[in-house]
Amino acid sequence: MRALTLLALLALATLCITGQAGAKPSGAESSKGAAFVSKQEGSEVVKRPRRYLYQWLGAPAPYPDPLEPKREVCELNPDCDELADHIGFQEAYRRFYGPV
């Protein structure tokens, strides 16, 4: 009985392996880069207006961070960016560019 079960499992495994080897990929899978899209195409798919993002919660949309432009300036300077990783953005910006 044990040998019969083992033989049936081996036959099933052989059928599965040979069935997958002969299968051809579908048209969607065969085109190169189909799994990846550009950032612009991806953002168009999930684009939604920010002001309506939290309307269903009854809370207003969050305001943009006023320090974001300064954070970007600090990120463009490799020394400021590295220091910001260690001591924080505001202190690193103050040391390189003056008061925040």
Curated annotation (Swiss-Prot):
Belongs to the osteocalcin/matrix Gla protein family. Residues 24-51 form a propeptide. It comes from the Eukaryota. Residues 1-23 form the signal peptide. Gamma-carboxyglutamate residues are formed by vitamin K dependent carboxylation by GGCX. These residues are essential for the binding of calcium. Decarboxylation promotes the hormone activity. The modification 4-hydroxyproline is found at residue 60. The lineage of its organism: Eukaryota, Metazoa, Chordata, Craniata, Vertebrata. Ca(2+) 3 binds at residues 75, 81. SUPFAM superfamilies: GLA-domain. The modification 4-carboxyglutamate is found at residues 68, 72, 75. GO terms for cellular component: cytoplasm; extracellular region. Ca(2+) 1 binds at residue 68. Its main location: secreted. This is Osteocalcin. It comes from Macaca nemestrina (Pig-tailed macaque). PROSITE patterns: GLA_1, GLA_2. Keywords: Biomineralization, Calcium, Cleavage on pair of basic residues, Disulfide bond, Gamma-carboxyglutamic acid, Hormone, Hydroxylation, Metal-binding, Secreted, Signal. Transmembrane segments: none annotated.
